[in-house]
Amino acid sequence: MVFSLRVTLTGIKGFFRVYKVNGATTLYTLHKQLRSDLEFPQDQLIMFKALDPDGSVLGRYGLFDLGSGTVDQVSLEKAVAAGVSTFVYFYDVTNRKSVTISIEGEEPGLRISPDSPLLAESKGPNPIEFENGYVAFEDLPDKQRVLPGEESDEDLDDEDFEDEDLDEEEEEDDEDGKEIYDESE
């Protein structure tokens, strides 16, 4: 059985990854793949928080047993059978840095090794870029979403102000057409 998983950052539209993962894949194997693909630090404790469709916590899985088992004992199949629909994957527990992993469904007829999840779709840079100030176009406020070559409403307002500036310059000319010199400028 192969599952489709969507990895997202909460509140950010400009980032996602879609993986095709064998049901026999352990959470530890998934962790190693995510850490590699998304360039997460290797020296941090990790945790998978399993949630049901209502958002209730079903279990927590880490490198050490947190009461529900360790990441190398729990396969994706077992988690889905237990009712898990979403994981919050903390790749840096200390600093509470996480991504959301949603189980989108089964992929019939697809064969994938349990040892290597397949990255099927990708959008946006890695999460570290968002921490460094990167803002995806989709996440910009509507008034800042202007493509090159398009005019925004603000550009039209600026043109009106430029016309007023020209009128003021014309008023500064003397009656005989000579410009008046002002020392304060």
Where are these regions (language model features)?
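Short linear regulatory motifs enriched in tryptophan with gly/pro/ser
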Residues: 1-185
